[in-house]
Curated annotation (Swiss-Prot):
Keyword Cell division listed: yes
Any one GO CC term of the record: cytosol
Gene3D superfamilies: 3.30.465.10, UDP-N-acetylenolpyruvoylglucosamine reductase, C-terminal domain (3.90.78.10), Uridine Diphospho-n-acetylenolpyruvylglucosamine Reductase, domain 2 (3.30.43.10)
Localisation: Cytoplasm
Protein's organism: Listeria monocytogenes serotype 4b (strain CLIP80459)
Record-linked SUPFAM superfamilies: FAD-binding/transporter-associated domain-like, Uridine diphospho-N-Acetylenolpyruvylglucosamine reductase, MurB, C-terminal domain
Function: Cell wall formation.
Listed cofactors: FAD
A molecular function (GO) term: UDP-N-acetylmuramate dehydrogenase activity
GO BP, sorted A to Z: cell division; cell wall organization; peptidoglycan biosynthetic process; regulation of cell shape
Enzyme active site: R170, S220 (proton donor), E290
Keyword presence, Cell division: yes
Name listed for the protein in its UniProt record: UDP-N-acetylenolpyruvoylglucosamine reductase
Family annotation (Pfam families): FAD_binding_4 (PF01565), MurB_C (PF02873)
Amino acid sequence: MNNLQTQFPHIAIKLNEPLSKYTYTKTGGAADVFVMPKTIEETQEVVAYCHQNKIPLTILGNGSNLIIKDGGIRGVILHLDLLQTIERNNTQIIAMSGAKLIDTAKFALDESLSGLEFACGIPGSIGGALHMNAGAYGGEISDVLEAATVLTQTGELKKLKRSELKAAYRFSTIAEKNYIVLDATFSLALEEKNLIQAKMDELTAAREAKQPLEYPSCGSVFKRPPGHFAGKLIQDSGLQGHIIGGAQVSLKHAGFIVNIGGATATDYMNLIAYVQQTVREKFDVELETEVKIIGEDK
């Protein structure tokens, strides 16, 4: 795998790169090979090479709704953070995979385009948002997604239309088929800028009041179980404030687990498992993780 630096001298590549620098939890082991393409063509080259040489490939977006285990990740990590262009085409916005969702919502505001207000505080990338059909406060990415350009795991380029992008709660065709998002097209509506700003301000205030933004975290840990709210179940189980190592069930919102200092990915995973077990025993409800967990144990 170290041959990648020789094979692709024009692409930024690091070896044994600590991944804790790239996750919102500030945890995670090292990547064997960490690749940062600057263009779609470079991305396609690396994906095709990994497929041809049977090298394990993992895509890393903004690292926000993600836990990387303490043993790190074998093979190649493809970090698409440098693909950040956002453009307007009439009432549509085209954003590349590495663009931040927050920046895309701000771009829409600046262009007086409405539809992405719900995303103004979601700390993910466009690629990650499409992968899990990210949403908040009654809105989801699939509501405004018109099309997406993706790579298959073999390096084949595909343009998917809205009808092909099946989406459900925290699920998408992109995740199901393990596609690599390159860009996304959103269909928005013209609106007065002050009205868009007012909606964003309202959602930002709600987010700041309810979420533990003062600590590193992986965002909402659990999916909403049918007929329940995960945070309420955790709170009613007496787990709010529970600590394992440096990981704590947030005192501000029980649906979040925060790093109060020196947490490891193992602390997070042990606390997640303890919460799931306790809620199962008390309420006979299975809490399914929304956060993605990848990598190897140490």
